[in-house]
Amino acid sequence: MTANGRRGHRRAQSSIIGVAVLVAVTVLSVGALTMAAGTFVSDGVAASNAQRVADDLDRIDDGDGATRIEFSRGTLRVEPRTVRLLRGGITVVGVEADALVYESGGRRVTSLNGLVVDGRGNQSRTRGPLPVVAGDGRLLVDIVALNASGSTAVGGSDPVSVTVRTNATHEYRTFEEDRYAVAIETATPGAWDRAFAAAGLERSRRDFDGDGVPSVVVSVPESVVVDLAVHDLRTVVRRG
C-alpha cells in the first residue's frame, strides 16, 4: 500500500471511530436526559401530592365533618404520638394525640396536634397556629387528639381516595399558677423547634419513653396559670 493509501485508510478509520464515539455519546446523553426527565416528573408528582395532602390535612382540625384526601401514590397512616403537660418536670396530663402521616417519594406531610408539618429535616416547615401561646401570666395550651379508628394505613402506587371523618368533643381545664412546660412528641422536631423559637418560647428535647422519637419541650421562664383545651376529634379513617 502506498503512503497516500495508508493515509487515506487511517482517515477512514478515524472517521468511523469518530462517528461511533459521537453515536455513543448521543445515546448516553439521551439516556441521561430520559432518566433526568423521569426523575423530574416523579419529583413533581410527589411534590404535587404532598401539597394537596397538606391542604386537605389543614381542614381536618377544623372540627366536625368529613375530609376527602386524594393522592396518586404514597401512604397515609397513623403514628403514635403523645402530648404532655408538665409541672416541675412531672407529667400532669398526657394525651395520646397521634399523628396522621403522608409519605411519597421522599416527601412527608404530618398532621399533629393541630399543626401541619410539610417536609423533612431542615427543609420542613409548619402550617397553622401554634398550639402553645404564652402571655400576660397565662399559658394557653391546645391538645388535639386524633383518637383514630378504622384503617391505620392506606396507600399504594395507584390513585387513592381516603375519607377522614371527625366528630369532636372538647374539654377545658385551668391549672393554678406554677412552672409548666408542654412536650410534643414528633418525628420532625426541627420544624416545631423553629416555629416555637420564632414565637420567643424556650425549647429543649427529651425522649420520654425511650422509643427514639423525641419530644420538643416548650416552657416559659416564670410561673403561669395554664388554660388547657383538649380536643378529641374521634377520627375515623376509611378508604374511598
Describe every region a protein language model picked out.
Residues V93-S223, G240:
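Intrinsically disordered, low-complexity regions enriched in Pro/Ser/Thr/Gly and acidic residues
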Residues A36-L130, N147, A168:
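Extracellular/luminal recognition modules and glycoprotein regions
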Residues M1-D61:
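Hydrophobic alpha-helical segments
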Residues V224-G240:
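Short, low-complexity, Pro/Ser/Thr/Gly-rich segments in the mature regions of secreted, periplasmic
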Residues I16-I17, I60, I69, I90, ...:
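Weak global preference for isoleucine
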